[in-house]
Amino acid sequence: MRNIIILACTECKQKNYTTTKNKRTMQGRFEIKKYCRFCRSHKLHRETK
């Protein structure tokens, strides 16, 4: 089962992206480097609660 998650920038805490995640195969918090339009650069985005 895939769940919808929200990705937030670790620098400015803005919620920029949504994606899906399979909870069976991916344990823990999802992290990926993506572009943050508020910081105007590529930053680490982490799954929020």
Curated annotation (Swiss-Prot):
Matches recorded under Pfam families: Ribosomal_L33 (PF00471)
Keywords: Ribonucleoprotein, Ribosomal protein
Any GO CC annotation of this UniProt entry: ribonucleoprotein complex
Gene3D superfamilies the UniProt entry points to: Ribosomal protein L33
GO molecular function: structural constituent of ribosome
GO process terms (BP): translation
The protein, known as: Large ribosomal subunit protein bL33
Species for this entry: Syntrophus aciditrophicus (strain SB)
Gene from which the chain derives: rpmG
